[in-house]
Amino acid sequence: MAILVTGGAGYIGSAAVKDLLGKGETVVVLDNLVYGHRAAVDASAIFYEGEIGDETLVQKILDEHEIEACMHFSAYAYVGESVEKPNIYYENNFVQTLKLLNVLLKNNVVKFIFSSTCATYGEPQYVPIDEKHPQFPSSPYGWSKFMVERALSDYDTAYDLKYVALRYFNACGAADACGEDHDPETHLIPLILFAAQGKRDSIAIFGDDYPTPDGTAIRDYIHIADLSQAHLLALEHLRKNGASEFVNLGNGGG
């Protein structure tokens, strides 16, 4: 049987593909290459270029491969852009995901691992944030992910879809051949490195009134190698008939 990985040509998805292959899994990747890179996909994976909401294409993949589970990385993920273009975020991240889910369910693929985000929480009411923290996103990006979470919960109740929704905090780092290649780059750590290398004039860190020793912000980062392994653990959990879960992914510090 095979694992369908949507967004498998992206930053985190490509790392998960490599780790799945390393465990002897058969991997089928579906990516539209809007933000992903074909070269990032391990040559041992089976690759399809297209949209997750293309029901005909998804059905073709399911007809040609015995899919056991889906790891769903595919999403637009820029908070600022989501404010400027909320329509494409709700369409791609929510509507297209529902189309994907419906085809999977029609074919009895009922194991689903979802890349969610800490952005579903919005402004923290307390820290550290746990999975019981109230959710009220502050951006269309966060809302688009939150809406998928609500759909997953309802699909479990109605259709017995079993899922693990992993709420990432701040992904960073590189794993073997897999790393960041965003254009334009928006992640903090690469921007700091660009400034150190003289590739940009400076880096501005905003905010000086946070409740921290020096007033600046503290962020929780998690390495993509750890994120990838968390997805493999989620897959094993579902294979053992584990219950659906929402899980924060961070290191608990800053």
Region locations from a protein language model:
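Conserved metal-phosphate-binding beta-hairpin within the catalytic cores
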Residues: 249
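Short, small/polar-rich loop/turn modules that mediate ligand/substrate recognition or access, typified
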Residues: 243
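NAD(P)-dependent short-chain dehydrogenase/reductase
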Residues: 153-233, 253
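N-terminal Rossmann-like NAD(P)+-binding domain of SDR-like oxidoreductases, especially those catalyzing
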Residues: 1-171
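A residue-level signal for beta-strand positions that form part of recognition/binding surfaces
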Residues: 126, 202-203, 246
